[in-house]
Amino acid sequence: ARRKLLDKLTVEEMPASSRRYPFVGFTMERECGKEILAVEGLSKTVDGRKVLDNVSFRVNKGDKIAFVGEDELAKTTLFKIIMGELEPDEGTYKWGTTITTSYFPLDNSAFFNDCDLNLVDWLAQFTPKIPEANTESFKRAFLGRMLFSGDDVFKPVKVLSGGEKVRCMLSRMMLYGSNVLVLDQPTNHLDLESITAVNNGLVDFKGVVLFSSHDHEFVQTIANRIMVLEDGKLTDRLGTYEDYIASMANAAE
């Protein structure tokens, strides 16, 4: 499966970058089974405020779920808990046995601050452990399609701009071949071309996506299920973002 993933990433086949649109494409090494994720009664208090209050939901095969609502901390806290970075005060979550995850955190500073690696060596940390992926030409070609070309690839990662760091984090996710992607505001710091590329990559992805974003069009084009987090409570809207906006408008009337 690793080999099949890498066949798609061979240097010859990599789309020639126009220096405007990065190429973002996620492939799965294995299909999701029936059990994806079950969340039961999650509660969490942060700095004296209950940001999650008895939150329960199940994720199904084919779901692309946008978590929406004004409370950014609630969404980030939920993602951190299901990714094992934070303990809940109460409740449980369980990933299915076939599931492999890749996580795009809201704050990526831990990956770059105090890191003395250049881009090629940084990417090498996440490259599959098979010979063809560990060649300089593979890594340079991979970075090239994410708009890092020439001597750019030897820049220390700690001096990269916000948008460049986001492209690095997306590159890392693409190399993992996971069947579930969890993304906390992946469009922050990106220009329109990069947002379009991420959008297309997530629309085409055959696995499961859990994400948050302030970009309404991004949510509308990707999500087939909306979950609203308000005052610590979760409401599952089993429709598109357009349906959700329409129902909000009706409620306001």
Predicted segments with their positions:
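C-terminal boundary and immediately downstream tail of ABC-type ATPase nucleotide-binding domains
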Residues: 6-16, 245-253
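Loop segments that connect adjacent transmembrane helices in multi-pass transporters
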Residues: 1-5
